[in-house]
């Protein structure tokens, strides 16, 4: 009873946190992201519901009663063997059906999020996520098939080798694409005005509310999260050895590669992954110069100054591939020490998190202006 109550309470708490911060249930893949979650936990605030407090109190009362009543059931050796044998048999049947028999898929049940999951089947949802962690080879996959696709889409190779600077701006998005609203000031006037010598468009993200490294994985490898189990983090689960990527492709053409990220090296196992990708240089927060902070994160302006510094320090004739992951706009958006500069017209102060987020994007726009 005691151990069962503890496990149930921890599982329930994990689901409550995931619902608040990610808008979905707790999956087995989230266990591998625990260290990353701890790194950024200080910027989030958890709203503990009365229902969770009540559940914790009831669990505590149940444990105390179980301990005080104590004692073991008066069963003979034969009864104990039968009971344990039956329990093992049930566990074995359940394990075979769920993990090896694909009972959910056989009956047309897919592991997809819907609003009823939280109320009806969080445990089933978690258990099925364990089975789905094994990645199956897609149908029709082969080196020959890849070569054929490559031949069809091949573009003529030019003689120029420009410097390549790829910046993935943390949590940056255009909310105007999903809602019609006006603000007291323009949010991203410089970025919106980029037209000359510019190719632009919308990019759909495979993640929402977290799992930044999954978008990073897609960019650097050209692979898609469509074939990765829901809730999994490739950086922590699948990249364990040297892997072809944009890094290796450019290095084969004579480029020097460098990854810059103004945060801890432990986040999403980046230090080990960048080594597998073969980056020539890797810089995390300890190696950034003249750091300035906003809500506890290095500002984009300060980040870009370090990026410019590495570019200007290049050797004569050296071609660079600089890969930069920013941190300024990371959640949460409840900082009381930050005064928002953007307000939603007609709804001033009604959506403080949205206004703080939009204000941060405005700061990014200014930094991009200085960078370019």
Predicted regions span which residues?
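Transmembrane and membrane-interface helices of multi-pass
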Residues: 1-116
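Short, well-ordered coil↔helix boundary/capping segments
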Residues: 4, 27-31, 120, 355-365
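Short secondary-structure junctions and interdomain/linker hinges
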Residues: 17, 44-48, 64, 71-72, ...
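Helix N-terminus capping/helix-initiation residues
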Residues: 27, 49, 121, 142-143, ...
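Alpha-helix initiation and N-capping motif
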Residues: 31-34, 119-126, 188, 213-216, ...
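Membrane-interface transmembrane-helix boundary segments in multi-pass integral membrane proteins
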Residues: 39-56, 122, 126-130, 134, ...
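Membrane-interface segments at or immediately adjacent to transmembrane helices
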Residues: 98-167, 179
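Solvent-exposed soluble domains appended to multi-pass membrane proteins
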Residues: 150-160, 166-169, 174-372
């Amino acid at each position: 009873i005691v151990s069962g109550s503890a496990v149930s309470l921890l599982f329930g708490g994990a689901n409550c946190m995931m619902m608040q911060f990610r808008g979905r249930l707790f999956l087995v893949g989230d266990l591998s992201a625990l260290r990353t979650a701890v790194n950024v936990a200080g910027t989030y605030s958890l709203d503990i519901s009365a229902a969770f407090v009540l559940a914790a109190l009831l669990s505590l009362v149940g444990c105390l009663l179980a301990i005080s009543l104590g004692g073991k059931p008066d069963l003979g050796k034969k009864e104990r063997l039968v009971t344990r044998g039956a329990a093992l048999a049930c566990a074995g049947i359940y394990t075979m059906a769920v993990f090896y028999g694909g009972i959910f898929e056989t009956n047309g049940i897919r592991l997809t999020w819907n609003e009823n999951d939280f109320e009806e089947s969080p445990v089933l949802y978690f258990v099925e996520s364990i089975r789905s962690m094994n990645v199956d080879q897609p149908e029709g996959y082969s080196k020959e098939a890849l070569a054929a696709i490559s031949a069809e889409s091949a573009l003529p190779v030019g003689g120029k080798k420009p410097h390549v600077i790829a910046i993935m701006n943390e949590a940056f998005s255009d909310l105007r694409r999903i809602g019609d609203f006006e603000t007291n000031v323009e949010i991203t006037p410089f970025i919106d005005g980029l037209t000359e010598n510019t190719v632009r468009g919308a990019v759909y993200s495979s993640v929402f509310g977290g799992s930044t490294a999954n978008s990073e994985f897609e960019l650097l490898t050209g692979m898609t999260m469509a074939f990765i189990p829901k809730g999994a983090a490739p950086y922590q689960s699948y990249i364990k050895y040297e892997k072809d990527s944009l890094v290796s492709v450019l290095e084969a053409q004579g480029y020097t590669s460098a990854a810059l990220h103004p945060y801890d090296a432990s986040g999403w196992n980046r230090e080990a992954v960048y080594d597998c990708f073969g980056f020539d240089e890797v810089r995390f927060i300890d190696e950034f110069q003249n750091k300035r902070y906003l809500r506890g994160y290095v500002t984009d302006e300060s980040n870009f100054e370090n990026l410019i510094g590495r570019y200007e320090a290049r050797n004569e004739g050296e071609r660079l591939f600089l890969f930069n992951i920013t941190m300024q706009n990371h959640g949460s958006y409840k900082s009381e020490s930050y005064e928002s500069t953007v307000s939603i017209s007609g709804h001033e102060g009604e959506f403080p998190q949205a206004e703080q987020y939009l204000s941060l994007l405005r700061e990014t726009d200014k930094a991009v202006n200085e960078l370019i």
